[in-house]
Design a protein with these regions (language model features):
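Short regulatory "switch" loops immediately downstream of catalytic or recognition motifs
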Residues: 8-11, 53-63, 118-123, 152-155
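N-terminal strand-loop-strand
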Residues: 1-34, 61
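Short, solvent-exposed coil/turn elements at secondary-structure transition points
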Residues: 11, 23, 37-39, 71, ...
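Intrinsic-disorder/low-complexity loop/linker signature
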Residues: 13-14, 64, 76-78, 87, ...
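The catalytic Nudix box helix
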Residues: 33-89
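Residue-level detector of short, conserved catalytic/binding motifs and their immediate flanks
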Residues: 3-5, 44, 112, 142
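Nudix hydrolase/Nudix homology domain
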Residues: 25-30, 90-186
Length: 186
């Protein structure tokens, strides 16, 4: 079992979706959600919340990204912030999540990815921190990317290979992106 989140935000009256990319390994070059496997005692939401904080190395909600480090204490301090965003989004739009195509019926994939509204943040400072890390402060070099809703829909329609397979396998994701657009863009 696992879960993820694709944050979205409004900037200049447009909806953008936040993805990450990596530079090494099997996910390199793809647009990736923030997600992973469940820890003991976690439900889908708790997993998605923790995974976002871990995979952004606690920088997204840090006041000083140069001092951000991924520690249990920092992760635990940010959980209530992200929980509140999940609560705010899902209390109004409880259907803004997708399951992953089950795949093999003998071993179906049990996965949920949530689409949650986050405050917009300029991600350049975060990306510079990852790029400048030579001492191993971060677990893996990543880069965050804001993707406009229209571009994301075009990728799903014409170039799904740009998406990490787990994001490609989300059932009804384009419909949720359309619903978010109808709800959020003027």
């Amino acid at each position: 079992m696992g879960a993820g989140v694709i944050p979205f935000a409004i900037s200049d009256c447009k909806v953008y979706f936040l993805f990450q990319t990596t530079f090494t390994g099997r996910k390199a070059g793809h647009l990736i959600d923030f997600g992973g496997g469940q820890d003991v005692g976690e439900d889908y939401r708790k997993t998605a919340i923790r995974e976002f904080i871990e995979e952004t190395e606690t920088m997204y909600f840090s006041d000083n990204v140069r001092q951000a480090t991924r520690t249990v204490e920092r992760i635990n301090n940010q959980i209530p912030i992200v929980e509140a965003l999940f609560d705010a989004t899902l209390s109004i739009n409880p259907h803004w999540w997708c399951r992953r195509t089950p795949g093999n019926p003998l071993r179906p994939k049990r996965w949920k990815t949530f689409f949650i509204e986050f405050p917009f943040r300029d991600i350049e400072a975060l990306n510079r921190e990852w790029e400048a890390d030579k001492a191993g402060r971060f677990k893996k070099r990543r880069e965050l990317v804001w993707v406009a809703a229209a571009e994301l829909l075009a990728i799903y329609d014409k170039a799904p290979e740009k998406l990490w397979k787990r994001v490609r396998q989300l059932e009804h994701a384009p419909e949720i992106v359309h619903a978010i657009l109808q709800h959020k863009e003027p």
